[in-house]
From Swiss-Prot:
Involved in the biosynthesis of the thiazole moiety of thiamine. Catalyzes the conversion of NAD and glycine to adenosine diphosphate 5-(2-hydroxyethyl)-4-methylthiazole-2-carboxylate (ADT), an adenylated thiazole intermediate, using free sulfide as a source of sulfur. The lineage of its organism: Archaea, Thermoproteota, Thermoprotei, Sulfolobales, Sulfolobaceae. It comes from Saccharolobus islandicus (strain M.14.25 / Kamchatka #1) (Sulfolobus islandicus). Glycine binds at residue 237. NCBIfam families: sulfide-dependent adenosine diphosphate thiazole synthase. This is Thiamine thiazole synthase. It catalyses: hydrogen sulfide + glycine + NAD(+) = ADP-5-ethyl-4-methylthiazole-2-carboxylate + nicotinamide + 3 H2O + H(+). The gene is thi4.
């Protein structure tokens, strides 16, 4: 096959990448919402927040998105979704196979690819390879006002490097089972009054509903979504059924949108 390929020299490759990357960072250094974790709840939240017109930035420590979706069920490449979460997946064009009334099997690769694409197409910015290791806080009133970030590779190398800061009107902990952002805030800002009882063992039937019900604000400016909710609220885990994860993301997006609208009205 003969093909005429545009020739691009190395310096131009570097300049264009550096310029466009820095423009993104410069634009999003002041965001409406920062979501930590590009798993199912984080991506769902990003999709609905961006659709609502909020400047939404997602940090993911890995070089891929999807969180626990990719691992499927013990590396089996299928997952379970139940009603009414199927409505969210249909909205982003994920194909579902109904195996009993209200219960669906989905392909893990398709699920995470289409959910991420939907969030990006809605306007969310996802940046990989970045770890959030602290938060910004303010007093009078006491609130979380952003995050401190570092390259994941820098942390893995145990290099002593200061972070940079990203401001946000709302920070969402979608880091999963360890609720990493909320755990840091609880430890370093005790006046927030956050107590973390820890996640309980599996009880899928109850866990799904309880996770969605308990999704939301943990402290002013700080919210929990997905498995971070089970850690912070002492709820049971549910395993490879992902309805609550995407519903939790949608729920936290709706709460943040309302909270920020109220804040704008007050100011």
């Amino acid at each position: 096959m003969e093909v005429k390929i545009k020739q691009v020299e190395e310096v131009k490759i570097s300049r264009y990448i550096i310029k466009e990357t820095m423009e993104d960072w410069y634009q999003f250094v002041e965001s409406d919402v920062v979501i930590v974790g590009a798993g199912p709840s984080g991506l769902s939240a990003a999709y609905y927040l961006a659709k609502a017109g909020l400047k939404t930035l997602v940090f993911e420590r890995r070089l891929s998105f999807g969180g626990g979706i990719g691992g499927g069920a013990m590396l089996f490449h299928k997952l379970i979704i139940e009603k009414p979460a199927d409505e969210i997946l249909r909205e982003v064009n994920v194909r579902l196979k109904e195996v009993e009334e209200g219960v669906y099997v989905v392909d893990s690769a398709e699920f995470m690819a289409k959910l991420a694409t939907a969030a990006i197409d809605a306007g969310a910015k996802i940046i990989h390879g970045v770890t959030v290791d602290d938060v910004i806080f303010r007093e009078n009133p006491l609130r979380v006002a952003g995050v401190a970030v570092e390259w994941t590779a820098t942390q893995m190398a145990s290099l002593h490097v200061d972070p940079i800061f990203i401001s946000a009107k709302a920070v969402v902990d979608a880091t999963g089972h360890d609720a990493e952002v909320i755990s840091v805030a609880a430890r370093k800002i005790p006046e927030l009054g956050i107590v973390i009882p820890g996640e309980k063992s599996a009880y899928s039937e109850r866990a799904e509903e309880l996770t969605v019900i308990n999704t939301g604000k943990v402290a002013e400016g700080l919210y929990a979504a997905g498995m971070a909710v089970t850690e912070v609220k002492g709820l049971p885990r549910m395993g490879p059924i992902f309805g609550a994860m995407v519903l939790s993301g949608k729920a936290v997006a709706e709460e943040i949108t309302k909270d920020l609208l109220k804040s704008e009205i007050r100011t």
